[in-house]
């Protein structure tokens, strides 16, 4: 399967649960190498939108093209290959396998692709970069929450993905580890030009990204409208 480069294009995306429309006609573009945050209050549809854009949850209607390929028109084999080669995922909870060591968890995507030996040295390099060199052979239950999340980020990066999709990657971390993760993602985007789309409710985190997309009740709104809605909500309290 041949891949081309052209970023992410979302057109009139909608998601309905029962009689409720959660995502309401979202259209947006993300260029190659961009670092974008999805912001908004809890329940605004941020995570739902991220999961649809990243191929994990099909929309009710609308189209999502990544590198000019309509991802929901791919067959199962194509989307599996696309995810494994071009996408990395980071979640609020790391979902690491406790029976394996840090390095074994990082190498899981390479193992699935049958490329374990080819990526061994790079996996070790990532853990060293993330200050985990002396813990790469530790099982996950011996790591702190911040260390485990760094392992999860290394796992997302090990196949050199073009796209990183992150859903509240600092949501379960203290302020010190939050800054570590923020700095790692900023460095990855700057040095490797990896396109990153991150969901966050943290304004400090969002301010570190190149661009913010503001969601209110499933709609993308301008910064001016977003600030006005926030101000109105505070006044109503």
From Swiss-Prot:
> What Enzyme Commission number(s) appear in the record?
7.6.2.-
What cellular component GO annotations does this protein have?
A: plasma membrane
Residues bound to ATP: 40-47
Going by the UniProt record, its keywords in alphabetical order are: ATP-binding, Cell inner membrane, Cell membrane, Membrane, Nucleotide-binding, Translocase, Transport
Q: How does it sit in the bilayer?
A: Peripheral membrane protein
Chief location of this protein?
membrane
**CDD domains named in the record:** ABC_MJ0796_LolCDE_FtsE (cd03255)
Q: Per its UniProt record, what InterPro entries does this chain match?
A: AAA+_ATPase, ABC_transporter-like_ATP-bd, ABC_transporter-like_CS, MacB-like_ATP-bd, P-loop_NTPase
PROSITE patterns for this protein: ABC_TRANSPORTER_1, ABC_TRANSPORTER_2, LOLD
Q: Where in the cell is it found?
A: Cell inner membrane
Which superkingdom?
Bacteria
**How is the subunit organization of this protein annotated in UniProt?**
The complex is composed of two ATP-binding proteins (LolD) and two transmembrane proteins (LolC and LolE).
Q: Which family does it belong to?
A: Belongs to the ABC transporter superfamily. Lipoprotein translocase (TC 3.A.1.125) family.
**What is the annotated role of this protein in its UniProt record?**
Part of the ABC transporter complex LolCDE involved in the translocation of mature outer membrane-directed lipoproteins, from the inner membrane to the periplasmic chaperone, LolA. Responsible for the formation of the LolA-lipoprotein complex in an ATP-dependent manner.
Name used for this protein in its record: Lipoprotein-releasing system ATP-binding protein LolD
- The source organism is Leptospira interrogans serogroup Icterohaemorrhagiae serovar copenhageni (strain Fiocruz L1-130)
């Amino acid at each position: 399967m041949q891949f081309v480069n052209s970023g992410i294009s979302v057109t009139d995306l909608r998601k309905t649960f029962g009689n409720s429309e959660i995502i309401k006609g979202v259209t947006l573009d993300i260029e190659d190498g961009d670092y974008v945050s999805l912001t908004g209050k809890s329940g605004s549809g941020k995570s739902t939108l991220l999961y649809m854009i990243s191929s994990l949850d099909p929309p009710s209607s609308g189209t999502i093209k990544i590198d000019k390929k309509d991802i929901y028109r791919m067959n199962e084999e194509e989307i599996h290959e696309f995810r494994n080669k071009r996408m990395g995922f980071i979640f609020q909870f790391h979902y690491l396998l406790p029976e394996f060591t840090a390095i074994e968890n990082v190498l899981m995507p390479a193992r699935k692709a049958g490329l374990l030996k080819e990526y061994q040295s790079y996996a070790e390099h990532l853990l060293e970069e993330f200050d985990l060199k002396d813990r790469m052979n530790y099982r996950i239950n011996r790591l702190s929450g911040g260390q485990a999340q760094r392992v999860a980020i290394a796992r997302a990066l090990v196949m050199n993905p073009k796209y990183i999709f992150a859903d509240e990657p600092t949501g379960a971390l203290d302020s010190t580890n939050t800054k570590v993760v923020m700095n790692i993602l900023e460095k990855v985007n700057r040095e490797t030009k990896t396109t990153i789309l991150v969901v966050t409710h943290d304004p400090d985190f969002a301010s570190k990204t190149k661009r913010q997309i503001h969601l209110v009740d499933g709609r993308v709104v301008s910064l001016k409208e977003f600030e006005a809605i926030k101000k109105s909500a505070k006044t109503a309290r």
